[in-house]
Amino acid sequence: MPTDTLGLAVANPVPRKRRLPGDRQRWAAGASVLALALLWWAATRFGWVDVLFLPAPEQLFEALQRLWQEGYLDASLLQHVGTSLLRVLLALGAAVLTAIPLGVLMGLNPLAGAALDPLVEFYRPIPPLAYLPLIVIWFGIGELSKVLLIYLALFAPLLIATAAGVRRVDRSRVQAVRCLGASRWQVVRYVILPSALPEVLTGLRIALGVGWSTLVAAELIAANRGLGFMVQSAAQFLATDVVVVGILLIAAIALAFELGLRWVQRRFAAWG
């Protein structure tokens, strides 16, 4: 090959299309979901599992359509979904308003951290069902008990993540801002909170996962609406299709929250 032709080939290599890592991850996620769906279909189609224990996919679509049109136990499907959403959102709002400020305080003040940490670590490992009877005795069977149970599940993960994020803030940045005359509030607002935001959002994601798993326990308390109530009530009548539809709806809503928080984390806390 002539030298000038070889030089041209080296200087102008043929571009190759490379698949991005994100594309591979999406393909892997889609393949796993498809494989699970095929396994589910085969198990019900060929009789590997009795439909009483695992309804076929077409049965679930029929149950969802029936629930959408007729509702369940004197409430529409939207009312069940809306009631559960409202309970989780109220608990989430209360957790954000209390856990984040207390987490900042624990991260900035070692004395406050030493005082609050044993209390949080004492109740955090206790399953919500364990203190559910106490909540009913103390606060009755109204909405407060349901929201409070979910709130307690959300509070500890968010508090611990916030405190850890504040402790990891670079102290040289804090000192630099203070040397410029910033007040304590300005340091917290413009330095500490933005720096701790990735950990706070991660804690929020973990807390919401725990909160949604506590929803069913919360709706044990004399509820007549909600997805958790629907699942428990249908289980008593062996309406497995309604049980699975309720579980899948809870999972879908929780996944939507998770994906939304991931987007917020990428958009506003990419440095974490």
Predicted feature descriptions by range:
Residues 161-206, 227, 231:
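Short cytoplasmic-facing helical segments at TM-TM junctions of multi-pass membrane proteins
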Residues 148, 152, 184-218, 241-245, ...:
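Transmembrane alpha-helices
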Residues 1-34, 259-272:
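Transmembrane alpha-helical segments of polytopic membrane transport and secretion proteins
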Residues 90-120:
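Transmembrane-helix boundary motif in ABC transporter permease subunits
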Residues 17-18, 46-93:
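Periplasmic/extracellular loop-to-transmembrane helix junction in inner-membrane transport proteins
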Residues 61, 74, 78, 82, ...:
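Alpha-helical membrane-protein architecture signal
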Residues 137, 213-250, 269-272:
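Glycine-rich helix-loop "coupling/hinge" segments at transmembrane-helix boundaries
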Residues 121-157, 164-165:
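Generic hydrophobic transmembrane alpha-helix motif, especially the helices
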